[in-house]
Curated annotation (Swiss-Prot):
Gene3D superfamilies for this protein: Tetracycline Repressor, domain 2
Mitochondrion in keyword set: no
Self-association state and partner proteins as the record states: Homodimer.
Domain HTH tetR-type intervals: 10-70
Highest taxon of source: Bacteria
Binding site for Mg(2+): 181
GO MF terms, alphabetically ordered: DNA binding; magnesium ion binding
Gene giving rise to this polypeptide: acnR
UniProt source species: Corynebacterium jeikeium (strain K411)
Alphabetical list of Pfam families matching this protein: TetR_N
Listed name of the protein: HTH-type transcriptional repressor AcnR
Key words of the record: DNA-binding, Magnesium, Metal-binding, Repressor, Transcription, Transcription regulation
Residues at which citrate binds: 79-80, 130, 134, 185
UniProt xrefs under SUPFAM superfamilies: Homeodomain-like, Tetracyclin repressor-like, C-terminal domain
Amino acid sequence: MPKVSDTDLAERKVEILSGARHCFATYGYDGATVARLEETIGKSRGAIFHHYGNKDQLFLEVAHEDMRKMAELAADEGLIGAIRTLVKSNDLTDWWGMRVEITRRVNIDPCFAAKWELDQLALRETVRTRLREQRASGRIRKDVEIETIAQTLELVLEGVLGRLAQRQGTEGLSDALDFVESALRSPGH
């Protein structure tokens, strides 16, 4: 049996997660049958579930990967910057569709909700760490608590998610995000 390089293995996992994201976003968790996953991903069930033991693990890994990406963007660009990047993204439909399905699963599956909450905590901490750094550098207001600013940003994220989930489009979002950013900045920044 030929040895598969770590690079090839990583590429296969990326392909599987990308295809699974599209399938879950298109059909929902329940509608993403194994046959649909195979068709969308372009790999056999054996190849898919060799890496991810079952559909639950695959869904959780896609959700985890999306949250990791969001936390990475938030660490680099702030939460508003992360929202901007995602809104401009080519895979926007799949990302937002997956996010809607994650929200649905959180509401009906306590086990999934508990695992998802761990990823949410990581994002929350990333956002708060970035806000503390921004405050220390004088870029954001000092007259509002960090927790209040963080909750405001989380509400903005959820509002954008809701708007996009309802297919209301992105028109005007950039201006709204500019407004939120300017409201949080220190005078002169």
